C-alpha cells in the first residue's frame, strides 16, 4: 500500500447541511491513476491545524465511474479537523491525501441480477451513497433499498442527491427515511434503527432474499442490524459493515502491563529497519511508541477502525484491543493493527512492506 501523502486542490465546497460540507478535489493528471477508487473506499487527509499535524479518514462519496473524488465532513463537537474543514477550508486550498483504501465493497459485474440493502445513520451515508451510485450504474438489473436514519429532515446529508437518484432509478431504488426527533406521517418512519424497527421493516424487506447488505454508522446500530440479520440466518459473508468512530479515540483502553520486562520492537518499512522499545511501566501500543520515538509510520484513525496502520507480525506476539479494520482471514495470516497492538513478548518484529 502506498502510504505517501499527495497534495490535492479543493475544487468545490458544497454545504450539504448546516453542519456538513462536501469537498470535491481536483486530482492532478499525474495522480489520476493513483486516486482511482472503488465504491465504499476512503481517503486519509492530513493538515496542520494550530501548528499541529492532524490526520483523519473520510469515506469517498462519489460514483467510482463518473465523478471526481469527494468526501463529506460532518462537524462534530470538539472535532479539530471537522471544525477546520467546515469553517476555515476554502476553494483553492490544498489538502494532503493518501491514496484510496478500504474494503467496504463487493465486486460488481454488469451481468449481476442482485438485490442490495443498506443501512446508514447520519454521516454513515457517505460510503453508502458511493456504493449506491456505482452499483446502480454498473448493474442495470440490480436493485437497492436504503434505510437511512437521521435526527430530522434538515440533517439529512445528500438529501438532494438521493432524491435525484430516486428519480433516475424509480423502479430500482427504494429509500426509507427514519427520523428520531421529527414526527413522520407513518409510524415506520419515526424512531431509531433497533430491533423493533427492524421487525417493522420485515413487512417491506424479505431478509433472506437479499444478496448483499451494507451497514455504516455508530457501533450500536451496526451490531444491532448485524445480529438481527444473523438471527434471520443471513450468511455472515454477505453482511458488510464500516464502523465510524471519533479520531484518536480507541473503543477500549489498555490498562494492564502485558510484559514483565522491556519489549524490543523491530519495524520494517520502505525497506528500512528501525528499533523501538516499550517499557512495561508505560505500556504503549506499537504505533504510538514508534511515533513518540521519532518514527514515521502510516496511521489515521488510531481507533482500530481503518487499516492504515496495518502490518504483518513476523516475530513475537501481541494482543490487539480491537481490530474492526481487519478481516478474519487477515488476522489468521498474521496481520495486525499497530495502533491497537501491545507486545506480550520481549522481542517483536513487524513488517509494513508485506
Regions from the language model: what does each represent?
Residues 2-94, 98, 114, 150-152, ...:
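Ferredoxin-reductase
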Residues 60, 298-308:
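Cysteine-centered iron-sulfur cluster-binding motifs in ferredoxin-type domains/subunits
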Residues 291-293, 308-354:
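Iron-sulfur (Fe-S) cluster-binding segments and ferredoxin-like electron-carrier domains
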Residues 64-67, 109-114, 343-352:
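Ligand-binding loop in jelly-roll beta-barrel domains
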Residues 84-260, 264-266:
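FNR/FR-type flavoprotein reductase catalytic core
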Residues 261-298:
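C-terminal accessory/binding modules appended to enzymatic or scaffolding proteins
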Amino acid at each position: 500500500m502506498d502510504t505517501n501523502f499527495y497534495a490535492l486542490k479543493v475544487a468545490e465546497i458544497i454545504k450539504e447541511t448546516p453542519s456538513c460540507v462536501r469537498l470535491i478535489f481536483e486530482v492532478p493528471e499525474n495522480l489520476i491513476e493513483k486516486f482511482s477508487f472503488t465504491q465504499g473506499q476512503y481517503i486519509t487527509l492530513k493538515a496542520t491545524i494550530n501548528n499541529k499535524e492532524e490526520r483523519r479518514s473520510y469515506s469517498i462519496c462519489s460514483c467510482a465511474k463518473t465523478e471526481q473524488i469527494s468526501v463529506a465532513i460532518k462537524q462534530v463537537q470538539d472535532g479539530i479537523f471537522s471544525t477546520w474543514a467546515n469553517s476555515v477550508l476554502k476553494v483553492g486550498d490544498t489538502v494532503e491525501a493518501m491514496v484510496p483504501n478500504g474494503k467496504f465493497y463487493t465486486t460488481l459485474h454488469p451481468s449481476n441480477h442482485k438485490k442490495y440493502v443498506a443501512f446508514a445513520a447520519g454521516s454513515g451515508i457517505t460510503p453508502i451513497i458511493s456504493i449506491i451510485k456505482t452499483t446502480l450504474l454498473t448493474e442495470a438489473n440490480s436493485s437497492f433499498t436504503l434505510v437511512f436514519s437521521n435526527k430530522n429532515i434538515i440533517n439529512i446529508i445528500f438529501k438532494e442527491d438521493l432524491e435525484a437518484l430516486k428519480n433516475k432509478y424509480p423502479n430500482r431504488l427504494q429509500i426509507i427515511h427514519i427520523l428520531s426527533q421529527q414526527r413522520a406521517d407513518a409510524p415506520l418512519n419515526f424512531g431509531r434503527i433497533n430491533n423493533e424497527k427492524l421487525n417493522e421493516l420485515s413487512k417491506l424487506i424479505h431478509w433472506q432474499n437479499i444478496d448483499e447488505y451494507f451497514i455504516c454508522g455508530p457501533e450500536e446500530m451496526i451490531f444491532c442490524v448485524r445480529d438481527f440479520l444473523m438471527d434471520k440466518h443471513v450468511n455472515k459473508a454477505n453482511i458488510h459493515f464500516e464502523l465510524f468512530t471519533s479520531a484518536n479515540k480507541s473503543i477500549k483502553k489498555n490498562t494492564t502491563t502485558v510484559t514483565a520486562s522491556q519489549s524490543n520492537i523491530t519495524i520494517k518499512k520502505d525497506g528500512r529497519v528501525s528499533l523501538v522499545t516499550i517499557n512495561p511501566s508505560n505500556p504503549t501500543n506499537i504505533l504510538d511508541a514508534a511515533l513518540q520515538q521519532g518514527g514515521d509510520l502510516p496511521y489515521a484513525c488510531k481507533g482500530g477502525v481503518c487499516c492504515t496502520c496495518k502490518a504483518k507480525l513476523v516475530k513475537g506476539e501481541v494482543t490487539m484491543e480491537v481490530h474492526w479494520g481487519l478481516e478474519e482471514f487477515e488476522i489468521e495470516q498474521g496481520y495486525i493493527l499497530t495502533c491497537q497492538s501491545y507486545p506480550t513478548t520481549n522481542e517483536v518484529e513487524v513488517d509494513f512492506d508485506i
